[in-house]
């Protein structure tokens, strides 16, 4: 999954947790540069929560990541305008194309793998080394996430 805004609702969080518990590898890439501070801090909150559950998270360090892609089981791909956030799910008129094509899925996976070379893999240690002020901003932004 590549997304600039990662503020999942309960259904997406549950789906990701079920996938991880089923032994499916879940990789998510988010940007390093915030264009909306509250959205980015909420994204960091959810990133930390998922790292603790077994999701692999990458922070793209080569500019602002604006890709909105997903590959499922090496067979299904999603590309479009929808972010993984409340606004895209409930408010905005976003659209994604779902393609059932192994070649496209492989191509998007190759792009993701190439992009990981420009990433920092996020770990629990990364979050533990953050200041209390930054963690406060993450928790506060999480409270605002339904309206972000």
Positions of the model-derived regions?
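PLD/PLD-like phosphodiesterase catalytic module centered on the HKD motif
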Residues: 4-148
